[in-house]
Amino acid sequence: MSVIMTLRVSGDPNKLEQLAGENQDMIRGISQRAKDQGLIAHRFYGSEGQIMVVDEWPDPESFQRFWEAEQANIGPMMEQVATSEPEITFWRKLETGDDVGWAWLRPPPSGSTHR
């Protein structure tokens, strides 16, 4: 079962968007290398004074390998936008029987007509 990884820092979401826009090739390269390490899904979110990354990975170890390998690329960007150390948490999906949405993240089961 895959895990959700959240990474939260205090920082400037607008500055992150600006840096991403100015460094699209670097961002795409990081994303591609993350996919090569097993990344399933990824988003950045921002709130007043906070930045959060929400990823889905096969397991925590896949993320950790990626994170360690990419510090030379991610670190300088984090230094420009973050005002705190990252808080990384791994979450497992709870089976509560009330799932709604997110079906678009994975292809439908073989033979399914669900879109």
Feature locations, PLM:
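Short S/T/G/P-rich N-terminal loop/turn motif that feeds into the first structured element of a domain
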Residues: 1-52, 56-72, 80-115
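Active-site phosphate/pyrophosphate- and oxyanion-stabilizing loops and adjacent acidic/basic residues
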Residues: 76
